UniProtKB/Swiss-Prot annotation:
Alphabetized UniProt keyword annotations: Aminoacyl-tRNA synthetase, ATP-binding, Cytoplasm, Ligase, Metal-binding, Nucleotide-binding, Protein biosynthesis, RNA-binding, tRNA-binding, Zinc
Residue ranges annotated as motif 'HIGH' region: 12-22
Domain tRNA-binding: from-to ranges: 577-679
Family assignment from sequence similarity: Belongs to the class-I aminoacyl-tRNA synthetase family. MetG type 1 subfamily.
Domain of life: Bacteria
Top enzyme class: ligase
Protein name: Methionine--tRNA ligase
Taxonomic lineage of the native organism: Bacteria, Pseudomonadati, Planctomycetota, Planctomycetia, Pirellulales
Assembly, per entry: Homodimer.
Gene3D superfamilies to which the protein is assigned, alphabetical: HUPs, Isoleucyl-tRNA Synthetase, Domain 1, Methionyl-tRNA synthetase, Zn-domain, Nucleic acid-binding proteins
List of residues binding Zn(2+): 143, 146, 156, 158
UniProt-listed PANTHER family: METHIONINE--TRNA LIGASE (PTHR45765), METHIONINE--TRNA LIGASE, CYTOPLASMIC (PTHR45765:SF1)
Organism the protein comes from: Rhodopirellula baltica (strain DSM 10527 / NCIMB 13988 / SH1)
Length: 679
């Protein structure tokens, strides 16, 4: 029976490029989806960019552009990289969409109606230099449980989770400053009220790998579940919570809802009903994720889905991390390789195959050993699989395929009989097992060609029928391998289809040989991977890292150069020129609108004692008058008074910015006194 499957990979964060570590997941998912489609199942591969949060806001601010510009540019780059590796999504969206906003409202209302949301004041880390509350990812410190230094803001490598305020010696990664603790109102989901449901789902649904279920039962479900902090105060880039103005949904609330929102976009474009994919017992929901985001997808997410009436995950496929040469990916070693850089040097099919040889259904880290990579790809793909076609391809273009399938010693039928076992391995996520089984078939097929010696038959006119038979067997065995490898190597499957004049579209094509047809001109199927190409790739990665480090050293906060371009530095002046300008600290005693002026506010500034100045400042679009009263500002106190039709202006308030709403009055630290000169 045809199955219907909704498949997702974790949404890549729109704050940086795709690298080979990310690709473990997207290739794993793509392989599984392609297998399901090859088997005739109806399968949607849904993804989107994860676009909200403080990181996006901070980066956009530093680059002098809007968050929208940043996430749109990043989305284009992500999709370009994915396409380069043959990763085919049925739909790729963005969490910053109206569909996602609507669904967030809907699910939020469900949580409210279920009495799962509470509000309370919490202490939160605040960066006094960056002037923002710090998300977990922007804090590092010593784990309060095991004492390991330089750990993330919300969890340690030891498996312990905590609040950022519990960290020992916390440091802001935005500015390097020591954060201070400030109180803010936050909204929480009371997960403990869902404890019984989550415990039952984790233990008995079959959705989780055994090691994952045991981890959750031992680390989380054995105790009372902590409330989930679901909101963040302004400033924050995201969706404002409709019934809590000034507060925004935490990125981990709206990000997984993006799975549903992207499906909604696909449904709208294809005339389908979202309920058939997210509220139907006839549809399976499969999530592929990394082990670092396990508890978001296995506790918070099922709780949200259950409460809002959406389908629960049928399976959460969790994978480990990528190491290179037995170590963590390293920029200094050149092993932190961007997808774009890899594509400049190496055939992406090589990485697709290598990852497939390493992936299993278990939560295990993968190791990309450079020497092993070269050996495995060249030996398996070029030396075995492609070798079958390349040794007879040119001859077959002349002879065509035999009218009936020749005697091959049972090779084709034996390979056909392995189809179910290979399919079962794919289905279970045991890609490494599937690759081993396929290579065993390649090992059995190659001796047939070696013993037949078609290159010698080609020299003898009387042996052309024999040559045609050998070509027929060899190309059909090659085609079987291409079908079995099609989920992993779609480009090779396409070339096989082009050669034999029949595209590979179904797993069942592995069960019946092709006969009595012509063969197209043989084209080179795959090149060997060269060690020097890998070395060049890693050298380029080192250079990229060095350039980024150099840029960070001269501009550690990633400040944009656009303001300087808009208003270049003025000509040099002497200290005597500067001393002519009398800058003074002043306090705003009163502020009011000027009805006749669109841009001006009328300010009365106190310089201490009875000394005051009346100033007209072009800051109306940026400031409410009442919010200025009492502030300390810096004014030019010796500017010649200027008579205006609204009154006399006796100075100037200093401010930065291009104008309009983007005007920022210069302040001064507390302790300074009105009347003091600014030197």
């Amino acid at each position: 029976m045809t199955r219907r499957l909704l498949v997702t990979a974790a949404l890549p964060y729109a704050n940086g490029p795709i690298h080979i570590g990310h690709l473990v997941e997207y290739l794993q998912t793509d392989i599984w989806v392609r297998f399901q489609k090859l088997r005739g199942n109806r399968c949607l591969y849904i993804c989107a960019d994860d676009t909200h949060g403080t990181a996006i806001m901070i980066r956009a601010r530093g680059e002098g552009r809007s968050e929208i510009e940043l996430i749109e540019e990043t989305s284009e780059a992500h999709q370009r990289d994915f396409a380069g590796f043959g990763i085919e999504f049925d739909h790729y969206g963005s969490t910053n969409s109206e569909e996602n906003r609507t669904l967030c409202h809907q699910i939020w209302k469900s949580l409210r109606d279920a009495d799962l949301v509470v509000e309370r004041s919490v202490e939160q880390l605040y960066d006094p230099e960056a002037e923002t509350f710090l998300a977990d990812r922007f804090v590092r410190g010593t784990c309060p449980k095991c004492g390991t230094p330089n750990q993330a803001g919300d969890n340690c490598n030891c498996g312990h989770t905590y609040s950022p305020t519990e960290l020992i010696d916390p440091v802001s990664t935005l500015s390097g400053a020591t954060p201070i603790i400030k109180e803010a109102e936050h909204l929480f989901v009371e997960l403990e009220k869902l404890h019984d449901f989550l415990s039952e789902w984790v233990s008995n649904s079959g959705a989780l790998q055994p090691e994952t279920a045991n981890y959750l039962k031992g680390h989380f479900l054995a105790d009372e579940l902590r409330d989930w902090d679901i909101s963040r105060p302004a400033p924050y880039f995201g969706f404002e919570i409709p019934d809590a103005p000034g507060n925004y949904w935490y990125v981990w609330f709206d990000a997984p809802i993006g799975y549903i929102a992207s499906t909604q976009q696909w449904c709208d474009a294809n005339g389908e009903d979202l309920a058939d994919w997210w509220k139907s017992d006839d549809c399976e929901v499969h999530h592929f994720i990394g082990k670092d985001i396990t508890y978001f997808h296995t506790l918070f997410w099922p709780g949200m889905l259950k409460t809002a009436g959406f389908s629960l995950p049928t399976k959460v496929h969790i994978h480990g991390f990528l190491n290179v040469n037995g170590k963590k990916m390293s920029k200094s070693d050149g092993t932190f390789v961007k997808a774009e850089t890899f594509l400049k040097h190496i055939d992406p099919s090589a990485l697709r195959y290598f990852y497939a040889t390493k992936l299993s259904s278990r939560v295990e880290d993968l190791d990309l050993g450079v020497d092993e990579f070269v050996e495995k790809v060249n030996s398996d793909l070029v030396g075995k699989v492609v070798n079958l076609a390349s040794r007879v391809g040119k001859f077959a273009s002349r002879t065509g395929l035999a009218p009936s399938y020749p005697e091959d010693g049972g090779l084709f039928q034996a390979a056909a009989a392995k189809g179910d076992e290979i399919a079962s391995a794919y289905e279970d996520g045991e890609f490494s097992k599937a690759m081993r089984l396929i290579m065993e078939l390649a090992d059995a097929a190659n001796p047939f060609v070696e013993h037949a010696k078609p290159w010698e038959m080609n020299k003898a006119p009387e042996r052309q029928d024999e040559l045609r038979d050998v070509c027929t067997v060899a190309l059909n065995l090659f085609r079987q391998l291409a079908v079995y490898l099609a989920p992993v190597l779609p480009e090779l499957a396409k070339k096989c289809g082009d050669l034999l004049g029949e595209p590979i579209t179904s797993w069942e094509q592995s069960q019946t040989p092709l006969v009595d047809r012509g063969v197209n001109k043989f084209q080179r199927m795959m090149d060997r991977v060269k060690t020097e190409d890998l070395e060049a790739m890693m050298e380029e990665s080192k250079d990229e890292a060095a350039q980024e480090t150099g840029a960070a050293a001269t501009n550690p906060f990633n400040d944009s150069d656009q303001p300087l371009k808009d208003e270049p530095l003025a000509d040099e002046i002497t200290i005597d020129d500067f001393m002519k300008v009398d800058l003074r600290v002043a306090r705003v005693l009163s502020a009011e609108h000027v009805p006749e002026a669109n841009k001006l506010l009328k300010l009365t500034l106190g310089l201490g004692g009875d000394e005051t100045r009346q100033v007209f400042a072009g800051i109306k679009a940026a400031y409410d008058p009442e919010k200025l009263v009492g502030r300390l500002v810096v004014m030019v106190a010796n500017l010649k008074p200027r008579k205006m039709r609204f009154g006399l202006s006796e100075g100037m308030v200093t401010a930065a910015g291009p104008g309009g709403e983007e005007v920022f009055v210069l302040g001064i630290d507390e302790g300074a006194l009105p009347g003091q000169r600014v030197h």
